[in-house]
């Protein structure tokens, strides 16, 4: 409660300082007939852009909304160049009205960028997860921040299940043997296990966490979850999962830990050396939430020592991950670029959801309540 009050106080303080030039509050208003400058930041697909007509989440195909926007007189700029003072995005910051980004190639929207963006009214995330935005600064400036809630929850939950099995069965070394022309069954089997009977805990049981638990139930695991809210009894029965209020009580019991919570100031670096030290030796960790929830070097040290038996995920800090990021080179990892939530099916959903919110914005209509991350100076509960 104290932290929530402090957050609100920060917002009010920043808002009141607008008179001194720090932030000018903006109204969520798109007058009918007004031409808007909309900027989208997506990953570039290059030769893959034309290989699938539904590949909408890339620069080249731009969520499939270019013709629609331009037919209404709006300007639509799309780029993948988002870092540094001379990047393409920076050129458009002063006069854009709407900025669209994705978690897979995020445009980091800092307080400094918000201050420069005098016309900015709306920040949209095509997907789920808006931690690339300084939400306190956005709230103080009176901006609206929204995302396409639910658009890729199935995609991410399925990917998490895949990663659990990949780690449990020691799949990656076997694949590497085949590619290298080798054959050494012992080199795989000595640390390959069944999923049945193992204890799996999810830290966070929102939409993705619940779907993962539902998909794990047929495997005959002991399922635990920690969240700020306990599920309804009927949902607990459906998932077969047991609520553990104390995270420190749950973690040492788990053979597999899955991270399913948002990145906030409270969760940033949460899995540090001290917390990792409390985990069961040989624990497997899957993190498709956000890379910054983990303390980078603490993960590397624990994997190299064997305290963490395997680590898999598709989220890094920063993104794209630099070539020298240590998670690329640590043993017993099954890392990929950030792809779990950008399947073709997910792209169709978040492209449609983005278009729907733009239509509502142009008409002056509210978004679906669950899509708001910042509205009227208030942050959504999961980010407080």
From Swiss-Prot:
<keyword id="KW-0520">NAD</keyword>
<comment type="function">
    <text>Catalyzes the NAD(+)-dependent oxidation of formate to carbon dioxide. Involved in the cell stress response.</text>
</comment>
<keyword id="KW-0560">Oxidoreductase</keyword>
<dbReference type="GO" id="GO:0005739">
    <property type="term" value="C:mitochondrion"/>
</dbReference>
<dbReference type="InterPro" id="IPR029753">
    <property type="entry name" value="D-isomer_DH_CS"/>
</dbReference>
<feature type="binding site">
    <location>
        <begin position="207"/>
        <end position="208"/>
    </location>
    <ligand>
        <name>NAD(+)</name>
    </ligand>
</feature>
<feature type="binding site">
    <location>
        <position position="128"/>
    </location>
    <ligand>
        <name>substrate</name>
    </ligand>
</feature>
<dbReference type="Pfam" id="PF00389">
    <property type="entry name" value="2-Hacid_dh"/>
</dbReference>
<dbReference type="GO" id="GO:0005829">
    <property type="term" value="C:cytosol"/>
</dbReference>
<dbReference type="GO" id="GO:0009507">
    <property type="term" value="C:chloroplast"/>
</dbReference>
<dbReference type="GO" id="GO:0009536">
    <property type="term" value="C:plastid"/>
</dbReference>
<feature type="binding site">
    <location>
        <position position="314"/>
    </location>
    <ligand>
        <name>NAD(+)</name>
    </ligand>
</feature>
<dbReference type="InterPro" id="IPR029752">
    <property type="entry name" value="D-isomer_DH_CS1"/>
</dbReference>
<feature type="transit peptide" description="Chloroplast and mitochondrion">
    <location>
        <begin position="1"/>
        <end position="29"/>
    </location>
</feature>
<dbReference type="InterPro" id="IPR033689">
    <property type="entry name" value="FDH_NAD-dep"/>
</dbReference>
<keyword id="KW-0934">Plastid</keyword>
<comment type="subunit">
    <text>Homodimer.</text>
</comment>
<dbReference type="Pfam" id="PF02826">
    <property type="entry name" value="2-Hacid_dh_C"/>
</dbReference>
<keyword id="KW-0809">Transit peptide</keyword>
<dbReference type="GO" id="GO:0009579">
    <property type="term" value="C:thylakoid"/>
</dbReference>
<feature type="binding site">
    <location>
        <position position="288"/>
    </location>
    <ligand>
        <name>NAD(+)</name>
    </ligand>
</feature>
<feature type="binding site">
    <location>
        <position position="152"/>
    </location>
    <ligand>
        <name>substrate</name>
    </ligand>
</feature>
<protein>
    <recommendedName>
        <fullName>Formate dehydrogenase, chloroplastic/mitochondrial</fullName>
        <ecNumber>1.17.1.9</ecNumber>
    </recommendedName>
</protein>
<dbReference type="InterPro" id="IPR036291">
    <property type="entry name" value="NAD(P)-bd_dom_sf"/>
</dbReference>
<dbReference type="GO" id="GO:0008863">
    <property type="term" value="F:formate dehydrogenase (NAD+) activity"/>
</dbReference>
<keyword id="KW-0496">Mitochondrion</keyword>
<dbReference type="InterPro" id="IPR006140">
    <property type="entry name" value="D-isomer_DH_NAD-bd"/>
</dbReference>
<feature type="binding site">
    <location>
        <begin position="338"/>
        <end position="341"/>
    </location>
    <ligand>
        <name>NAD(+)</name>
    </ligand>
</feature>
<feature type="binding site">
    <location>
        <begin position="262"/>
        <end position="266"/>
    </location>
    <ligand>
        <name>NAD(+)</name>
    </ligand>
</feature>
<feature type="site" description="Important for catalytic activity">
    <location>
        <position position="338"/>
    </location>
</feature>
<dbReference type="GO" id="GO:0042183">
    <property type="term" value="P:formate catabolic process"/>
</dbReference>
<feature type="binding site">
    <location>
        <position position="227"/>
    </location>
    <ligand>
        <name>NAD(+)</name>
    </ligand>
</feature>
<feature type="site" description="Important for catalytic activity">
    <location>
        <position position="290"/>
    </location>
</feature>
<dbReference type="GO" id="GO:0016616">
    <property type="term" value="F:oxidoreductase activity, acting on the CH-OH group of donors, NAD or NADP as acceptor"/>
</dbReference>
<dbReference type="GO" id="GO:0051287">
    <property type="term" value="F:NAD binding"/>
</dbReference>
<keyword id="KW-0150">Chloroplast</keyword>
<comment type="similarity">
    <text>Belongs to the D-isomer specific 2-hydroxyacid dehydrogenase family. FDH subfamily.</text>
</comment>
<dbReference type="InterPro" id="IPR006139">
    <property type="entry name" value="D-isomer_2_OHA_DH_cat_dom"/>
</dbReference>
